[in-house]
Amino acid sequence: MHDHITNTGGKCPVMHGALTTSSMATNMEWWPKALNLDILHQHDHKTNPMGANFNYQDAVKTLDVDALKRDLHALMTDSQDWWPADWGHYGGLMIRMTWHAAGTYRIADGRGGAGTGNQRFAPINSWPDNTNLDKARRLLWPLKKKYGNKLSWADLIAYAGTIAYESMGLKTFGFAFGREDIWHPEKDIYWGSEKEWLAPSDNPHSRYSGERDLENPLAAVMMGLIYVNPEGVDGNPDPLKTAHDIRITFSRMAMNDEETVALTAGGHTVGKCHGNGDATLLGPEPEAADLDDQGLGWLNKTQRGIGRNTVTSGIEGAWTTYPTQWDNGYFRLLLNYDWELKKSPAGAWQWEPINIKEEDKPVDVEDPSIRLSPIMTDADMAMKMDPDYRQISERFYQDPAYFAETFARAWFKLTHRDMGPKSRYIGPDVPQEDLLWQDPIPAGKTDYDPQAVKDKIAASGLSVSEMVCTAWDSARTFRGSDKRGGANGARIRLAPQKDWAGNEPARLAKVLPVLEAIATESGASVADVIVLAGNVGIEQAAQAAGVEITVPFAPGRGDATAEMTDVEGFAVLEPLHDGYRNWLQKDYVVSPEELMLDRTQLMGLTAPEMTVLVGGMRVLGTNYGGTKHGVLTDREGALTNDFFVNLTDMKYTWKPAGKNLYEIGDRHTGEVKWTATRVDLVFGCNSILRAYAEVYAQDDSNEKFIQDFVAAWTKVMNADRFDLA
């Protein structure tokens, strides 16, 4: 029965036909400029072991939070031989784990943060800055195992650091559960272009340009770091230069100077750095470790490598006299002593105090009869040397209660920044106070007649384009990364959104007063009326194409006020491009189609949804400024599949006519029929997108096109309706 098997040259006849590792060239390596549509198809049921019916938000509501809290408190002082706790307390380790999970967040695109449990996966689990955090997660495994599906890794990682602070005496601000785990690394997050860990700023693939301009949206200063280099810029100590890096990095995490000092000091009030050994003896990081290391990395298999002999950052020592308790010792030592540069046993730069009193020295992690010098990193010295940071540090030193409260609030912000609105918070310790950075929205109304509102809108004289564009612009700000933006709140009528160039303020000045008047008359929120107007426009466009439809609608959006809106905080949501409306504010290094892909991923759309939405928006005449690029139809304003029919028709040719401009002409006469942009033509050029375009161009697909367009449109309008989930 095996006679048909031929000689395979010693290779397995089955396995070597599959791309089972990354050692073989992929399509992206063969064609590196191809669109990476995989970023639109992540975290679905094929990778999620929980099944389609599992709802984490429901499951975590059944969690016994008090029992978990008791277990975490007990864990902090239950030292394990395989990874002993410093001074018998794991608090510093757990806090660093939580810090480094939450600290990947960046405000520019909302990506990163503690909300997904991504610290379990590459590349984050193997970054140099996360050395030995694999041990922290293994220490937590018994609790994750015990509480099972009621407790996500993401919530546990965030909660462990919070309880660690509580166990050491800090009154925390609160905590919310509700972070749902992902099951594979994110494919969409850009961490930088460097090809080596900790590449210096003069690296050929550096994230820096000019004097020291950090590439957007990055916040970390080096590949593999969470924040700044603790030894100094490119490893060269200079507290004032480090202060510059700190200010940029923390501002890109949505933190001001006071929050920055509080977080730096509060993070270093407890725990220690580890560099008492030879860093070259550490084994590879988890992703490169041997099979029998079972996911653990940085193992020292030639020396003891644990306890007082642990090597992590290479810096060695504690910041404070009592590293297992919350106090004001950080500022007391930093401000009252002079400090000098020294090298750690591992060869890292660190600052040590001159002529320190014996009683101010922390004790050894294993032997309390031994006292050792405390240390400061270059980042700590920046809190003393930078004038603005120094002023804040002095205030915190003089007012420990104010420092503790400021830190507790900043820690809460750090660990919850990517969770979205407060309505997503779950658990008994959710703070009652509404915070401006949470983008609060009042409760909406449902006690009105949506059909009566639609009738008023239809009679208002607004055009299909005006209604659809206004609804789209209101909703397109949504970011699935940190759950910000969206149509709920109707902030398109407030600063800064009403003045954004991409929202065409002149059009808004005409349309919004009409819709606001209808909202007042009907008792509906303006947010609901804006969405209803878009729905009316689509229904009218479908009717013009000979199809009667009703676009689904769910009332209940609220209207935010100016007092509820952080103008500066919302500035990062401003669209500088929108492929769906065929608009670029200016020319960018990144191609228009890549920008559209990035926006699509943030909005939570799939590649087929992106395709059908672009095709529909074009024929509805929703281009920015009324341009006709990509409007491949003679029936503008009617919801037809003409965009796809004409894009795939071989009777036309496509020729460049300028930067990001093409002419579509008759193949035989040469007569120019339409113009288009790269964003239009990519749906005929990219093999995957063309496959979707061909589906919608088929003779039997107009009804499917309309159904799919309406479904995708409704998804965008409801993206921030967490109450509907």
From Swiss-Prot:
The record marks R96 as: Transition state stabilizer. There is a cross-link at Y227-M253 (Tryptophyl-tyrosyl-methioninium (Tyr-Met) (with W-99)). It is an enzyme of class 1 (oxidoreductase). Heme b binds at H268. It catalyses: H2O2 + AH2 = A + 2 H2O; 2 H2O2 = O2 + 2 H2O. PROSITE patterns: PEROXIDASE_2 (PS00436), PEROXIDASE_4 (PS50873). There is a cross-link at W99-Y227 (Tryptophyl-tyrosyl-methioninium (Trp-Tyr) (with M-253)). Its EC number is 1.11.1.21. It holds the Pfam family peroxidase. The keyword GTP-binding does not apply. The active site is at H100. One of its GO terms (cellular component) is cytosol. One of its GO terms (molecular function) is heme binding. Binds 1 heme b (iron(II)-protoporphyrin IX) group per dimer. Formation of the three residue Trp-Tyr-Met cross-link is important for the catalase, but not the peroxidase activity of the enzyme. GO terms for biological process: cellular response to hydrogen peroxide; hydrogen peroxide catabolic process. Its cofactor is heme b. Keywords: Heme, Hydrogen peroxide, Iron, Metal-binding, Oxidoreductase, Peroxidase. NCBIfam families: cat_per_HPI, PRK15061.1. Belongs to the peroxidase family. Peroxidase/catalase subfamily. Homodimer or homotetramer. Bifunctional enzyme with both catalase and broad-spectrum peroxidase activity. This is Catalase-peroxidase.
